[in-house]
Structure formats: structure tokens, C-alpha cells
């Protein structure tokens, strides 16, 4: 039962007037959703201003929406995901950022055993609407510690959805 899952709005585009890079489109989408949803919060590693995330996807959002809704977390991935799960179960809409896919492994148990199975384990009484933003691949030529593509591990987990932004 996905009745309480994220509803995707139908949007029609007449024409695209501005060309922007994908990370700026992500920033615009996050900003737009925060304007429409007072329960949405963003937190993670270096997401608040002035940095706005390692790739600047959240740049300007803590200034625009306040440090109560966009804030930095400790560099502790399991803590980020665990906190997001708890907040989602209490009607918040957390969007969390893990700086690089390579860093997600300390949180894998919570994603697999808690987040992904919440609806099933509660017989549809609970849902856990968490968005985990994770840059993947070799964009910065980071080698061993910044270039993993983790989607193959996560795509087989029932209870989660994987989305890649695209033009």
C-alpha cells in the first residue's frame, strides 16, 4: 500500500527558458518543495550555508528557510539516517544528504532493517518518508573514497525507491 507515499505532482512545461546545470535544478526543486511543505527539513554533512553541501546542492537554503529547517549534522552517517527515520515516523519530511556514496555504509543496516521495512513491519500503520540524497560516481576524480556507485546494492531492497535526476 503506497497510499501515504510521496505524491508526485503532474507538471506541464511549455518551454524551458533557462539552461541550468543539474545541481542548480536540484537546489531549485528543494527550495520549491520547502516553500510548499513546512514539515520538510534538510540536514546532513555541510549542507548549511555558507558551503551548501559539497556540490552546493543546498546552497542558500539555510539562509532562505532558517537554521531550524536546514542544518548541518555531525559526520556520522548512521546518526543522520537514524535521526531521519525517527523524524519521519513523527510526521516530518526529512531530506538528508550523505556527502559521498562511499560514506553510506555505516548507515546501511538502518536503511535496510529500519527504513525500508517500516511499512511492512507495522502492517501499514507507519510509513517512513525519508529522502536520502547521495552523490554517486566519479565526478571529482576522487578515486577509492569518493567515486563509488552504490545503486546496485540498494536497488534490490524492497521498500525503497531510487531516483536519479535527469534532464
Region spans (language model):
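Thiamine diphosphate
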Residues: 2-166
Amino acid at each position: 500500500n503506497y497510499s501515504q507515499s510521496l505524491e508526485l505532482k503532474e507538471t506541464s512545461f511549455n518551454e524551458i527558458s533557462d539552461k541550468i546545470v543539474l545541481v542548480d535544478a536540484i537546489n531549485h526543486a528543494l527550495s520549491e518543495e520547502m516553500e510548499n511543505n513546512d514539515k520538510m527539513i534538510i540536514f546532513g554533512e555541510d549542507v548549511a550555508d555558507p558551503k551548501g553541501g559539497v556540490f552546493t546542492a543546498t546552497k542558500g537554503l539555510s539562509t532562505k528557510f532558517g537554521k531550524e529547517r536546514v542544518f548541518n549534522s555531525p559526520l556520522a552517517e548512521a546518526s543522520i539516517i537514524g535521526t531521519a527515520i525517527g523524524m519521519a515516523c513523527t510526521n516530518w519530511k526529512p531530506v538528508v544528504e550523505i556527502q559521498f556514496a562511499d560514506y553510506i555504509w555505516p548507515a546501511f543496516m538502518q536503511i535496510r532493517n529500519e527504513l525500508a521495512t517500516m511499512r511492512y513491519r507495522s502492517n501499514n500503520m507507519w510509513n517512513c518518508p525519508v529522502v536520502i540524497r547521495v552523490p554517486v560516481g566519479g565526478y571529482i576524480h576522487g578515486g577509492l573514497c569518493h567515486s563509488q556507485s552504490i545503486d546496485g546494492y540498494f536497488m534490490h531492497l524492497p521498500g525503497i525507491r531510487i531516483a536519479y535526476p535527469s534532464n
